[in-house]
Structure formats: structure tokens, C-alpha cells
């Protein structure tokens, strides 16, 4: 069940808006820039497969978040919680046995949730277009939306996106239930599994323990389970696995917006071959960047190199890059 949404900072604004699923509302958190640019610029953050906006772009380590950095650069920042996450309504199927339904929150459904959020934001701010930052699986609904509604999208920052991998001979993707429980141990393992054994941790235990408590707070029933765990829709994970069986949930060639792919050197979910394929597949994008940041993994936004991610994303959203020189 969703929990009441405390403000992370005093000037944060909260909105519950209608979503594409009947009788289910979506939650948006909004932090306007104190010194807004002229004209105003809005960024929508689209989260990944296991935790919502409060635990990602809005989470502060040592008093500062990615959202704060974007605000300082003049961007109004919005965070969407998909159905089944954070403060958005849960799918009714999440109250039943996980085996009784197909994986919840697939990209087609999620893209319609992104559209509902984007149209609300544009109307609220009286803007014609916005930029999107997505993480991991979140690139799938973000790019589906961008392809279907090119006039509404300024720029796309795809942080740790999932790419299509070649089909596996004699192998089909496994089937998954509707949802699963994700424990703190599951999340900690994600932070350490891709770090080379001879390298120091990319996230301190102190920071993880602080983040972990907030993660459990995102599901009102998490601490009633043994072990503690957050109920999470499995559509995103199922689509990651399908992408690695040559079934990517969107067509990159249909995206017309400028695109930046930002990834960590140690990101096991998008390697150099994946990135090259995805970069080339964005064939209609007028501006493309492939940015690899050292000593970082798939969860770079919560790691020691997070500020490098912030800087690169802001630079791209600002249109930074080499000028085109006439031939």
C-alpha cells in the first residue's frame, strides 16, 4: 500500500494525478528552481526497476542530491513514482498471490504513466516541452513516450539504460510472476556485485544504512515481513531479461530527441558492446553522447562518483558540447 508522503524539503510540492489505470492515481513530487532560467525548464525523472524518486534523484547524501544540483542549474525538477512504487497507488493484483497475474508495470503501461505525468507538468508550468532523465529500465517507457510524442520532449538523459542483446540460441525468456519482495540484502548486493574485488566500496555502509531505512519506508508493510522487504512490480525486471533475449520494449530508431547515454565503468547491465549498439540504434537523434564515468556501477547516482553523473547530465541538458564546424 502507498504511504503518506512527507516533504523531503520544505518547498517541495506534491501532486496526486489521474493515471492511465482506472481509479489509480500517480504521485509526482516537484521542486521548483529558486533561481529559474528564462524561459523555465523542467526535467522529469523516470525511475528504474526497484525504487522510486525519493530514493534516487531526490535522496540526499551528506545534505545534497542530484535534484539539488539540477535546481541550482535552473531546472524545475519533477519525480514520478510509477504505480506500485513509493506514493503512487498499488496495482490491485499486488494484494493477491504473485503467481495469479502477469508481471506488472510493463513498458507500454509505464509509458502511458509517463505521458500522464508529462502532460500534467507541461500544463502546470505552461511549457511546450520538457526533458527526461531516466535510470536503467526507466529508459524503456521514457523512450516509448519520446518516440510517440516527439513535440513534447526536449532532451533525454539515459543513465544506465538497458540495451538489446542478441537472441540466445535454443533459449526463450523465462516467465515471471506479478511482483516480488526486494530486501535490503538484495539492494546491498546490487551495490557491491560489479565492483572489482581489489577496489574499495563505491558506497559507504553508513550511507547505505541511511538509504535502506528510507527504502523500507517506501512500503508501509515492509517491516511486517521476515526478512524486511519491499513489494515491487516485476514487469521491469521481466523486460530487462527480454531485452537480453533480443526483445527490447521500444524502438530506438523512432526517437528523434537529443540523447545522452551515461554509464559507469563497472556497470554490468550495460557494457561497451551494449552501448555501441544502442548509440548506433538512435539513428534519428540529432545529437548523441556516450559518456562513461570511471569507478562507478549501475547505481552511480548513489555512489562516490555521483557528482560526476550530475555534472555530465546538467551539461547535456544545457546543450553543452562541441560546436558544429561547417565543412
Q: Which residue stretches match the model-derived regions?
A:
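Alpha/beta-hydrolase
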Residues: 167-260
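Conserved alpha/beta-hydrolase "acid-adjacent" motif
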Residues: 268-274
Amino acid at each position: 500500500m502507498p504511504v503518506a508522503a512527507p516533504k523531503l524539503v520544505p518547498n517541495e510540492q506534491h501532486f496526486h494525478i489521474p493515471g492511465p489505470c482506472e481509479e489509480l492515481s500517480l504521485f509526482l513530487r516537484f521542486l521548483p528552481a529558486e533561481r529559474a532560467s528564462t524561459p523555465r525548464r523542467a526535467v522529469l525523472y523516470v525511475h528504474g526497476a526497484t525504487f522510486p524518486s525519493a530514493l534516487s534523484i531526490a535522496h540526499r547524501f551528506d545534505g545534497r542530491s542530484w535534484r539539488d544540483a539540477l535546481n541550482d542549474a535552473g531546472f524545475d525538477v519533477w519525480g514520478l513514482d510509477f504505480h506500485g512504487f513509493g506514493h503512487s497507488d498499488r496495482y490491485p493484483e499486488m494484494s493477491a498471490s504473485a503467481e495469479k497475474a502477469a508481471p506488472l508495470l510493463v513498458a507500454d503501461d509505464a509509458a502511458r504513466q509517463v505521458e500522464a505525468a508529462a502532460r500534467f507538468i507541461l500544463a502546470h508550468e505552461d511549457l511546450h516541452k520538457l526533458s527526461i532523465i531516466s535510470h536503467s529500465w526507466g529508459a524503456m517507457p521514457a523512450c516509448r513516450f519520446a518516440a510517440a510524442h516527439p513535440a513534447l520532449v526536449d532532451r533525454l538523459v539515459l543513465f544506465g539504460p538497458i540495451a538489446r542483446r542478441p537472441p540466445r540460441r535454443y533459449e526463450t525468456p523465462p516467465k515471471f510472476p506479478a511482483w516480488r519482495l526486494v530486501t535490503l540484502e538484495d539492494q546491498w548486493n546490487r551495490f557491491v556485485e560489479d565492483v572489482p574485488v581489489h577496489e574499495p566500496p563505491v558506497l559507504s555502509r553508513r550511507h547505505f544504512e541511511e538509504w535502506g531505512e528510507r527504502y523500507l519506508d517506501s512500503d508501509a508493510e515492509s517491516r511486517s515481513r521476515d526478512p524486511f522487504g519491499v513489494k515491487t512490480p516485476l514487469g521491469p525486471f521481466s523486460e530487462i531479461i527480454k531485452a537480453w533475449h533480443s526483445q527490447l520494449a521500444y524502438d530506438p530508431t523512432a526517437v528523434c530527441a537529443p540523447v545522452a547515454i551515461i554509464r559507469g565503468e563497472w556497470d554490468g547491465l550495460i557494457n561497451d558492446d551494449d552501448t555501441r549498439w544502442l548509440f548506433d540504434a538512435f539513428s534519428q537523434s540529432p545529437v548523441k553522447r556516450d559518456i562513461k564515468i570511471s569507478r562507478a556501477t549501475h547505481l552511480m547516482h548513489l555512489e562516490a562518483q555521483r557528482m560526476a553523473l550530475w555534472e555530465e547530465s546538467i551539461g547535456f541538458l544545457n546543450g553543452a558540447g562541441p560546436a558544429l564546424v561547417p565543412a
